[in-house]
Amino acid sequence: MYKLMKNIQTTALNRTTLMFPLALVLFEFAVYIGNDLIQPAMLAITEDFGVSATWAPSSMSFYLLGGASVAWLLGPLSDRLGRKKVLLSGVLFFALCCFLILLTRQIEHFLTLRFLQGIGLSVISAVGYAAIQENFAERDAIKVMALMANISLLAPLLGPVLGAFLIDYVSWHWGFVAIALLALLSWVGLKKQMPSHKVSVTKQPFSYLFDDFKKVFSNRQFLGLTLALPLVGMPLMLWIALSPIILVDELKLTSVQYGLAQFPVFLGLIVGNIVLIKIIDRLALGKTVLIGLPIMLTGTLILILGVVWQAYLIPCLLIGMTLICFGEGISFSVLYRFALMSSEVSKGTVAAAVSMLLMTSFFAMIELVRYLYTQFHLWAFVLSAFAFIALWFTQPRLALKREMQERVAQDLH
C-alpha cells in the first residue's frame, strides 16, 4: 500500500510538466460543463420534448451511469495500450456524441446519447487521473488534482449562467456544439503534451482482468476508502441534479437568479481546494479530511434548519451547501489518492474500480432521491445529504484512520 508509492517513478512538478494536466483539465472542463451547462437547461429541454420536468435529473443520472458502464474496460485497456491512446480515443468519442445529440427528437434518444457522453467521465477518472497519479510524486499529485479541480470548477460556476443564457436567448443545441469544440481543442493539447510512455504491465489473457477486479474488490481497505468518495461527493451531486427543480420550479427563482445562486456554493469548493494546496505540506496526509467532514456535517444540519424555518430557506440552502462544498474541497483529492493507492493491482484497474463504484453510486442515489423528492420534496434532499455525510463517520472514517496510522509506521521505518 503506502510502500508501493515509493517504488513509482515520477516527474517533478514544473511549468513544462504542468502542460499535460492543463490539457487534460480542458477536457475535464468540457465533460463537467457537459453536465453543468445542460442541467439548468433541462427544464426547457423537457418542455421541448413534451415530457414532465421530473425527467430533468435523469439527464445527470444517465450521464453518470455512462461513466460507470465502461470504466471496467478503459482502465485495464489503458494499462495494456498506454494511457495516451485510450485517452485520445475517448476525447474524440465524447465530441462525436455531443454532435449526434443534436439529431434527437425524443427524450429516450436524448438520454441514450447522454449515457454515451457520460463515458467521458470514465475517460477522465479511469485513465486521465491514473496518468496524473503515476506521473507525479504523492503530494505533487494531490496538488495537481486540486489545481485541476479548481479549473474544472469553472464549469459549475459558469454553467448555470450560460445555461440561463441558452434558455432565454438561443437554443440548447448550441451548448453541445460548444462543448464538442472544446473537447476537440483539448484533444490537440493532449496529443502534443501528454507523455506517451506506458506503464510496464505483463501481457496476460484478458480473463486476468476479472481476477484483478476480484483482488481489488476483496480488499477491505480499498472498499472502506473508496466508499467514502460517493458519501462525501453525494450532497453536491444531488444539489447539481435537483437545484433546477428546487430553485426554479419550486421556489420560483428566475433562470438568472438560479445561476447567481450557484456562485457561493461552488466558490466554497474552489476555496476548499485552494486551502488544501496551501496546507497539505504542513499536515499529516488525511488530516484535512478529519477537518473537512465535520464542516460538511454542519452544512447538512443548516440545510435541515432551512426546511424547518421556511423564512430562512434560501439563505440556509446556500450557506449549508457552501460549507459542504468547502469541506469536500479540502477532503476529496486526499481520499481519492488514498483509495487509488490502497491496492497492489495496476493503477488503471484500480482507477476503473474506483470510477465504477463512484459513478454507479451516484446514478443509483440520484435516481432514488429523485423519486423521493416527488413524494417528500425538500425533506428528501436535506435528509439524504445529512445521511450520506453521517455515514462517513462509520466504517470509512475507521479506514482513513488505519491508513494514516500505517503511513506513520512506514515513515518511522
Swiss-Prot record:
The chain crosses the membrane at residues 18-38, 55-75, 84-104, 110-130, 147-167, 170-190, 228-248, 260-280, 289-309, 312-332, 349-369, 373-393. Disruption phenotype: Mutant shows a strong decrease in chloramphenicol resistance. Mutation does not affect susceptibility to quinolones, tetracyclines, aminoglycosides and imipenem. One of its GO terms (cellular component) is plasma membrane. The keyword Coiled coil does not apply. Its main location: membrane. It is found in: Cell inner membrane. Keywords: Antibiotic resistance, Cell inner membrane, Cell membrane, Membrane, Transmembrane, Transmembrane helix, Transport. Gene3D superfamilies: Multidrug resistance protein D. InterPro entries: MFS, MFS_dom, MFS_trans_sf, Sugar_transporter_CS. GO terms for biological process: response to antibiotic. One of its GO terms (molecular function) is transmembrane transporter activity. The keyword Nucleus does not apply. It is a multi-pass membrane protein. Belongs to the major facilitator superfamily. Efflux pump that mediates resistance to chloramphenicol. PANTHER family: BLL2771 PROTEIN (PTHR43271:SF2). This is Chloramphenicol resistance protein CraA. The lineage of its organism: Bacteria, Pseudomonadati, Pseudomonadota, Gammaproteobacteria, Moraxellales.
